């Protein structure tokens, strides 16, 4: 299936669902509140966004029309899940790098490997590069072009990759915004350490809340509304 050009908000919604499916499975599929919260995270997102409920709902409806997102009906709160792998005809490693590129912008193979450790574990950066080349080859073989390798930025050791689901990228702007090698490596190390710590804490918190809610349902105990609402906001 050929995916039509996505808007930045549609790409953010889709990428967020793909991320949360792997990183907080106990809270997945996501409610609208949790999805909006994930879209607007201040970490692991580039660029930062302020997506509101109406914008997220419009993006969901558009993605549903392409079978990229499904809406569940088994819960009192509508919940949403992605169908990217099947709709796009990609495997799990390919979906992982596409999701990361949608959420965090242009990245090198090494950055994708580090940033995606909680999604999928690659043996090394060469394995990530091989997946990116597979996606690039799909476009060269007559399929839909989904990724592009950017020219090497001044002072950079590696070339970055960008996704094409939102159309042709502005190469000049991307090259102008590329960090230097020292800046990129230092920032990546600090951010990765903080994100890994935060992600572990949030995953533990989401799992605990899920267990409490399950036990309360089994015992027929009504929990305070604040805890129930927190369950919908937990995956960040």
Swiss-Prot record:
This is UPF0502 protein Bpro_3844. HAMAP family: UPF0502. InterPro entries: DUF480 (IPR007432), WH-like_DNA-bd_sf (IPR036388), WH_DNA-bd_sf (IPR036390). It comes from Polaromonas sp. (strain JS666 / ATCC BAA-500). SUPFAM superfamilies: Winged helix' DNA-binding domain (SSF46785). Belongs to the UPF0502 family. Pfam families: DUF480. PANTHER family: UPF0502 PROTEIN YCEH.
């Amino acid at each position: 299936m050929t995916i039509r050009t996505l808007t930045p908000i549609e790409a953010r919604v889709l990428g967020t669902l793909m991320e949360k499916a792997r990183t907080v499975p106990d809270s997945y599929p996501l409610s609208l509140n949790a999805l909006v919260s994930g879209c607007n995270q201040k970490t692991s997102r580039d660029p930062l966004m302020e997506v509101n409920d109406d914008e997220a709902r419009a993006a969901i409806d558009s993605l549903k029309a392409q079978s990229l997102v499904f809406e569940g009906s088994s819960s009192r709160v509508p919940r949403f899940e992605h169908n990217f792998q099947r709709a796009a005809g990609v495997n799990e490693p390919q979906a992982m790098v596409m999701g990361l590129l949608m959420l965090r912008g242009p990245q090198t193979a090494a950055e994708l490997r580090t940033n995606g450790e909680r999604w999928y574990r690659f043996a090394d950066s060469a394995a990530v590069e091989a997946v990116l080349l597979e996606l690039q080859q799909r476009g060269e073989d007559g399929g839909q072009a989904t990724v592009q390798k950017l020219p090497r930025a001044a002072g950079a050791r590696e070339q970055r990759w960008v996704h094409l689901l939102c159309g042709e990228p502005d190469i000049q702007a991307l090259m102008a915004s590329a960090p230097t090698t020292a800046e990129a490596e230092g920032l990546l190390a600090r951010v990765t350490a903080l994100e890994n710590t935060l992600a572990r804490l949030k995953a533990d918190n989401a799992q605990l809340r899920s267990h409490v809610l399950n036990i309360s349902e089994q015992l027929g105990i009504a929990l305070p509304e604040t805890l129930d609402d927190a369950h919908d906001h937990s995956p960040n």
